[in-house]
Swiss-Prot record:
GO MF annotations in UniProt: pyridoxine 5'-phosphate synthase activity
Gene name for this UniProt entry: pdxJ
Top class in the EC scheme: transferase
CDD domains according to UniProt: PNPsynthase
Annotated 1-deoxy-D-xylulose 5-phosphate binding sites: D9, H10, R45, H50, T100
Residue numbers binding 3-amino-2-oxopropyl phosphate: N7, R18, G192, G213, H214
NCBIfam families, per database record: pdxJ, PRK05265.1-1, PRK05265.1-3, PRK05265.1-5
Protein name (database record): Pyridoxine 5'-phosphate synthase
Keyword terms, alphabetized: Cytoplasm, Pyridoxine biosynthesis, Transferase
Localization: Cytoplasm
Family, similarity comment: Belongs to the PNP synthase family.
Function: Catalyzes the complicated ring closure reaction between the two acyclic compounds 1-deoxy-D-xylulose-5-phosphate (DXP) and 3-amino-2-oxopropyl phosphate (1-amino-acetone-3-phosphate or AAP) to form pyridoxine 5'-phosphate (PNP) and inorganic phosphate.
Amino acid sequence: MAKLGVNIDHVATIRQARGGVEPDPVAAAAIAELAGADGITIHLREDRRHIQDRDLKLLRQTVKTRLNLEMAATDEMVNIAISVKPDMCTLVPEKRQELTTEGGLDVRLNLESIKEAVQRLQDGGLIVSLFIDPDPDQIKAADKTGADYIEIHTGAFAEARDWKSEQAELAKIENAIKLAGKLGMGINAGHGLNYANIRKVAALGGIEEYNIGHSIISKAVLVGLDRAVRDMVDLVKYA
């Protein structure tokens, strides 16, 4: 049965919009866990635009399920991860001007630097995942780094505007699942997944955990976080 990791970055985004102390992502994480989330995901960006160092440290102390830290493959972030010790580190690309992560890591182009970051994190006792597009060359490169997991970037599927394009993207995801499985890598997925499209990806099988944030927080504004998480748990686990 697949798991749901709830990304709470946008709780911090709302807090930072006013520079205050609420809503607190630490409290949101507790509610998400009580509602059935299997894990909590956060992205500590280099520019600290939403999640802050304080949040990471408190979440490490309070999260009862699993804490997944999305991070750039920089010396600063690697050192922070080794110090705080989340349950998983997911290496993601990062651009200061982007509103959200726009694509997967180019592991082929940056193989040596990513491999070094993976090794340092693993030497620190951490499980490492790479956020990549469902591209066979990127998956093979990810395997060469020694990473434990890949997280399939589902953004292109989520943004498909017609049935033909959607089916083509689903086929890429399905092939990525098969290839990563053959290579012995764990498989997660995320980006752009919502209440309307998650069943289509979940029906493929083979994915261990879905990391979903924006759609859950958007629904939470209307119906509350507990209800929003419970509804997504039902879709992920019983697709």
